Amino acid sequence: MIHNIRYRLFVYEDENEEELIGGLKNILPTAKIERELAEGMMEDEIIILSGKIDKKKETKEFLSSLLSMDKLSLEKLASDLQKKTDKSGNLFLRFSKTSACEEKWEICDVGDSIHLKIKIMAYPAKKEVAIKLLYEALNEVL
């Protein structure tokens, strides 16, 4: 159901990079992280951690873990699918950095988070088709 998952995480100067990598690995245990340095508006150093997961086994494990979240979180996700899915069938999720570091999954709507771009295997690759597949998967567990 998932073709690939792209992820991105910003580490600011006042954050612990290793701790945030641990949080990312809580959500994506097999992540092979690429590290890039950038400069913020105030000339502060920002580390960008990113990468892509495209192995079927790994994307299936992610989906299984996602669908194991508590009912309230899954119901909120189901109600937000229209605004979290683009016209090409990509699902955009953000996970709380703090919760991820505490080995919990919490979908959030704030910018300072772990960003996931999840390409849904929808044929044709359209928003409506992807949302239908996502609703079907969510309805199996709700």
Regions found by a protein language model. Give the residues of each.
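Short amphipathic alpha-helices in soluble, non-transmembrane regions
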Residues: I21-G23, F62-D70, K132-Y135
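Short glycine-/aliphatic-rich beta-strand segments at the starts of folded cytosolic domains
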Residues: H3-F10, L49, K87-L93, L116-I118
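Beta-strand elements of well-folded, non-transmembrane domains
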Residues: L9-E13, L28, K55-K57, K97-C101, ...
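Mid-chain, well-packed structural core segment of small domains
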Residues: L66-A100
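Long, hydrophobic N-terminal alpha-helical segment
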Residues: M1-R35
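Short, conserved charged micro-motifs
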Residues: N16-E19, K57-L63, E102, K126-I131
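Glycine-rich, aromatic-bearing surface loops/beta-hairpins
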Residues: L93-L142
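Short, charge-patterned binding micro-sites
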Residues: E34-E58
